[in-house]
């Protein structure tokens, strides 16, 4: 299993990660948002998925630079014990609160974040208000954390308690604040938490949980097997 960083619709990043997954016989790529597939009507990455032969299954949690309203109209299918949206053949979106079970891993998804550049974007064309999770979605996320006790969580942004170095006050942004509330209030602490949004490859430990920022444009993280130590490295 590979955890891929922000791709922003860059075809070469998808091709590099696909190539590595094939070489290493990894059947699944989990992507941490700002995916870029179907961001615009003409999408070369969607065309790539429609024509590629074989390769891993891709699953994204969605980021702030993704077309949430469109994605939520795509066909719903069952995958790994949960329901996801099929964006293209072999390419899926796991909406907020989706739980998927892969072998011994229970993986809980919760995408979205706030765009700091939304003043430069066009509503309904390059920015969508659904980028930010609602109160009810955070409530569902908390309840899923308590009920299902996932060992892996996948989000686009990270809780405030993760010391990510980035411009701006993350404590004033609704999504990292909401994620922090869920993490701090839940009695369950996942073993690993993968996220993107911050465009660098790094890791931290907060309490019992390893947090891993998965990088940008072809960078990725991978835990060896179903357990063991975390490995983080870029694809070049």
Predicted regions and their residues:
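Beta-strand-turn-beta hairpins that frame and shape the catalytic cleft
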Residues: 1-2, 98-109, 152, 205-211
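Structural motif
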Residues: 3, 28-32, 152-156, 194
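Core catalytic region of metal-dependent phosphoesterases/phosphodiesterases
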Residues: 4, 9-102, 178, 185-186, ...
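Active-site environment of divalent metal-dependent phosphoester hydrolases
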Residues: 8-15, 36-41, 64-72, 99-100, ...
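Conserved beta-sheet core of the metallophosphoesterase superfamily
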Residues: 50, 57-61, 81-85, 89, ...
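Active-site-proximal loop/helix segment associated with metal-binding centers of metalloenzymes
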Residues: 82, 103-171
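Active-site donor-binding loop signature of nucleotide-sugar glycosyltransferases
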Residues: 96, 112, 124-125, 214-216
